[in-house]
């Protein structure tokens, strides 16, 4: 019984020290076709650039850009992967990879995973987000909700505005 109580206390103390914060990002901008391979009327590979701006719930406003690879078969997205760059004030940067969870062409949902970041905001590395994206002609709007450590949110909040 003492061992069980000790294990529960250790687990409780461990989880108490791990706190997470919701980090909300909104991006908008233009989608630019870089290259496409048209295999048939319904099958293709397209490489896009997304360029625009973002704002977050920590009061930041910055630039964003992405490189997106899309494979479509029978007019259905079978694979979509992207690398996204966020550029904050003072050239502070964070990078995440995106994977789409659905197969619609004009809108989508998926996950981001932060892979790299400037030293001043490096606590965001390994954080995950759920995102949704919607296209209108060559414009896009993305909303993301990220579960990041409290330390990462404080680092992001401390970026000079």
Regions found by a protein language model. Name each.
Residues 20-161:
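Beta-strand-enriched cores of mature, soluble protein domains
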Residues 4-14:
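Sec-dependent N-terminal signal peptides
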């Amino acid at each position: 019984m003492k061992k069980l109580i000790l294990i529960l206390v250790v687990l409780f103390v461990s989880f108490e020290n791990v706190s997470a914060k919701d980090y909300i990002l909104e991006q908008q901008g233009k989608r630019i076709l870089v290259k496409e391979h048209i295999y048939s009327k319904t099958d293709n590979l397209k490489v896009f650039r997304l360029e625009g701006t973002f704002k977050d719930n920590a009061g930041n406003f910055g630039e964003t850009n992405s490189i997106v690879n899309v494979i479509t078969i029978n007019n259905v997205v079978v694979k979509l992967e992207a690398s996204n760059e966020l550029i904050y004030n003072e050239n502070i940067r964070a990078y995440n990879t995106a994977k789409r969870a659905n197969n619609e062409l004009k809108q989508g949902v998926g996950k981001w995973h932060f892979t790299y970041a400037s030293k001043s905001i490096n606590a965001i590395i390994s954080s995950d987000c759920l995102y949704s994206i919607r296209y209108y002609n060559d414009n896009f709007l993305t909303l993301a909700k990220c579960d990041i450590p409290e330390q990462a949110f404080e680092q992001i909040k401390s970026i000079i505005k």
